[in-house]
Amino acid sequence: MNSHPLMRLLRSRHTVMKLPSNAIKNDTMLPKIIPAIMAGGRGTRLWPLSRATAAKQFLKLIGEETLFQDTLKRVSDAKVYGAPLVITNEEFRFLVAEQARELGVTLSSIVLEPVPRNTAAAVAVAARIVADRFGEDALLLVLPSDHAITVDDTYKKCVRSACIAAAEGKLVTFGIQPTWPATGYGYIERGTYLGKDVHAVQCFVEKPSLEKAAALLETGNYYWNSGMFLFQAASIIAELEEHAPDVLSAVHAAVRGSTVDADFIRLAPESFSQAPSISIDYALMEKTANAAVVCSDFAWSDLGSWDAVWKNEEQNADGNVLKGNVTACNTKNSLVLSHTAHLAVQGMDGVAVIASEDAVFVGRLEEAHEIGNLVKRLAADENTARLTELHPTLIRPWGGYTTMLNGDRFQVRRLFVRPGKMLSLHKHFHRSEHWICVKGTAEVTIEDRVTILHENQSIYIPEGAIHRLGNPGKIMLELVEIQTGAYLGEDDIIRVADESRNEMPDSRRTGP
């Protein structure tokens, strides 16, 4: 295994950190925590903004950053945390890389799951990679990427307490002090007190009915299951070997057979697909005798519905959250959001009105958690399925594009290319393209001819012509692309050359 290029990559520049024998009494001697951020998912609960190609962790819902970026900032203290490991999928890989780049965050690795296999396999992947890179005594913090959390002294204290328990071999989960009888979360019953706000886990409870949730809340012994975990890599691997060996063996084979592609680690598809699709709670946490819970009371929300977004945003005097291009009249207790067309809402109470570039959702906030049923109905209809799959804006290594208009035999897009980046050299069989430079400078290659486009200039790319677009300038390049032809699908493309990092040669860049 050591000879595999991935293993050499993982072990390079790092030393194994051993835990001092007195670390349980002195938490200042604990090793750095290695965050493993779970950034997969399908993107259905906050439709129409979240889609299969853009899950809610990549949306700016609370504050100026996306939820994924907020998660990265939460583990940015280099005195406490090592570089984060991100587990995601093929569809989200460029979003992960781009949003980390925007913050200036260096990721340890971006690991791509070839197929979704739930959280047990994802946690096993993170544990195996962290053990190989940092040593089996390394502390692993597993975080969902789509939660809203206030990082204050209470939060930091809970993480320290979890570290101390994890260093003793406990598999620690974070239980959130419930503030209402929620039916959308699982619950954890606390058991024997272990010290420093940590209890043994007595049992896990499935998402309850409203009546049962109220009864659990009344006891004072139950906490919401946050889906956050902290443990030593060795501990979780040993427990998986005992309680979920089929998950662990498939993951080990997938890591051993993985390949490194540019900035991504691609798990071996055949091996990883053999892993059962099961949550870490079912596979392990409900079976192990070493489960512990940190009883936490920091501000937390999984933002799992538009109702949750409304509750977590600052409301005006009418109880409204108004974001973007919106006007509300005689409306209260509502969430109205649009960054595209102007939304005007009148005489409404307790509703969510959400507009994306190509769809609008209107529904009662109290029923917003049931939006998944609506998305399934849309996905089952061939006329609306694309509204659940494709987000109008897609991010690529070179920049990205937004689809502005679709029609019979034509499509209009806004392209944006980062400085020094270029697209692959390619051609289309069924469409021609017009490019209009709106901002910046474009280098356009058509067959053997290279043309420089400035603002307000345009160029035509005939059907079947080999072509490429690059940005040799120092500012973002923006173009309007008009496609015309009999077929405009994304699979009508033949790549002639595709530079792995989409970088322009230094000799063709402008400026010093």
UniProtKB/Swiss-Prot annotation:
Disulfide bond annotation, renumbered to this chain: none
SUPFAM superfamilies: Nucleotide-diphospho-sugar transferases, RmlC-like cupins
E.C. designation(s): 2.7.7.13
GO BP: any one term: GDP-mannose biosynthetic process
Origin: domain of life: Bacteria
Keyword Nucleotide-binding recorded: yes
GO molecular function: GTP binding; mannose-1-phosphate guanylyltransferase (GTP) activity
Similarity-based family: Belongs to the mannose-6-phosphate isomerase type 2 family.
Alphabetical list of NCBIfam families matching this protein: GMP_PMI (TIGR01479)
Name of the molecule in the record: Mannose-1-phosphate guanylyltransferase
Source organism of the structure: Sinorhizobium fredii (strain NBRC 101917 / NGR234)
